[in-house]
């Protein structure tokens, strides 16, 4: 495991929390720190996919020290998927240290390494030949993010959570399953069974950026819900939308049932929350209020 090396590039302050841009392992990140005396609980805020690569961390934290076009891009995205809010900023206002970085091919890492599907598939293919995966790199980066957050003097390392929408949801439950650093996770709009996602026309069948969440041979042993259930007995929250065309409701319900069986088998059924909302593929203000209140109960 390589040693951690960080450098603060810039910072800004608000009435509630201070913000800084950190660079570690040559990857820019946002860190939001509440004002007041810590240590504080923390959240790793994991951005979505959205087939929109010009921004990454800026989808979950209001950008600063950026060009006007980045600010406008982020504001439009927040309005489209997050009810006009930046979830990282909302969590910082609630007293959390918030960490957000770009996944490979998004934001600063997209502008530098290419944002087109051909480049993504080319890298994914080359990684497979090296015995690695794009999804594995994303998850490893998120694990290291949690390790970094735990090392911050402002953070209580026993109270770290993860939250994300869409691909950020996939990243959240993967991180909770893979890292003992993360104590709880809120995973929004990325959970179903593999058969339900392999229907003609679904994004999972198109290749392209699907490689960001695909692990070869995994399906021979585990489905997505089984991987997420490795997080048991941690508190976990899963929301999906009944009108979400990407995740068929029957597949979502089957996946939820698989996870409930695991938490129930460990006599911690009360630590798993699953809910279908009458919405599409979004994390709106009402959903945020319920998810953040749940996180407060387990991390504050």
Predicted regions and their residues:
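Short beta-strand element of the alpha/beta-hydrolase
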Residues: 29, 39-49
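Mobile cap/lid helix-loop segments that gate and shape the active-site cleft of serine hydrolases
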Residues: 122, 126-129, 137, 144, ...
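C-terminal catalytic histidine-bearing segment of alpha/beta-hydrolase fold enzymes
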Residues: 257-300
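Gly/Ala-rich beta-loop-alpha elbow adjacent to hydrolase catalytic centers
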Residues: 164-168, 172
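Short beta-strand/loop motif that positions the catalytic acidic residue
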Residues: 231, 238-240
């Amino acid at each position: 495991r390589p040693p951690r090396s960080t450098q603060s590039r810039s910072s800004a302050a608000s009435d509630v929390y201070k913000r800084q841009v950190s660079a570690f392992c040559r990857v820019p990140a946002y860190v939001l720190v509440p004002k007041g005396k810590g240590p504080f609980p923390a959240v790793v805020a994991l951005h979505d996919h959205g087939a929109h690569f010009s921004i990454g961390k800026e989808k979950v934290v209001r950008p600063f020290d950026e060009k006007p076009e980045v600010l406008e891009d982020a504001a439009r995205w927040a309005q489209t998927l997050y009810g006009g809010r930046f979830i990282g900023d909302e969590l910082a206002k609630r007293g959390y240290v918030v960490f957000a970085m770009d996944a490979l091919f998004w934001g600063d890492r997209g502008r530098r390494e290419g944002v087109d599907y051909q480049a993504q598939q080319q890298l994914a293919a080359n990684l497979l030949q090296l015995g690695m995966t794009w999804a594995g790199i994303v998850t490893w980066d998120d694990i290291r993010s949690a390790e970094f957050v735990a090392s911050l003097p402002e953070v209580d390392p026993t109270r770290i959570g993860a939250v994300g929408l869409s691909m950020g949801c996939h990243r959240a439950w993967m991180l909770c399953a893979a890292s003992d650093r993360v104590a709880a996770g809120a995973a929004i709009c990325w959970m179903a069974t593999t058969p339900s996602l392999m229907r003609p026309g679904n994004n999972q069948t198109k290749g392209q950026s699907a490689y960001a969440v695909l692990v070869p041979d995994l399906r021979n042993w585990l489905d997505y819900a089984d991987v997420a259930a490795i997080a048991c007995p941690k508190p976990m929250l899963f929301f999906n939308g009944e009108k979400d065309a990407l995740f068929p409701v029957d597949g979502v319900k089957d996946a939820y049932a698989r996870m409930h069986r695991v938490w129930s088998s460990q006599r911690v059924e009360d630590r798993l929350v699953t809910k279908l909302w009458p919405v599409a593929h979004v994390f709106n203000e009402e959903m945020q209020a319920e998810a953040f209140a749940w996180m407060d109960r387990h991390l504050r």
